Amino acid sequence: MCRPLVKAAQGYAKKMASQDFLDHTGKDGSTPGSRIQKAGYDWKNSRKNSMIAENIAAGQNSVLEVMRSWSKSKSHYKNMVNPAFTHVGFGMSINERAKYKKYWVQNLGFGATC
């Protein structure tokens, strides 16, 4: 696990749960890249070929369920099995009053230092 990617994932899962929404763009206009960079994963300045990806989900009750959901989605699965990614971080947050209750984030990265 990569601490900056975990920090970004957990922070964004908490934000989606507390604000009751599911989107790659935060209500504050933040993007996966900006959140990951802010958390300390310096992917923008590390190498020309560095990259990141974010998978999000909501409503699944367990890690197994969310991983199965991502595996059934072509774009999410493509992120998870991309051999270029060498770092990962996960986050999950619960808000019983929110529509989906549980919110999940998986961040993937390559080219920066964890």
Regions found by a protein language model. Give the residues of each.
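Disulfide-stabilized extracellular recognition modules
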Residues: 49, 53, 57-114
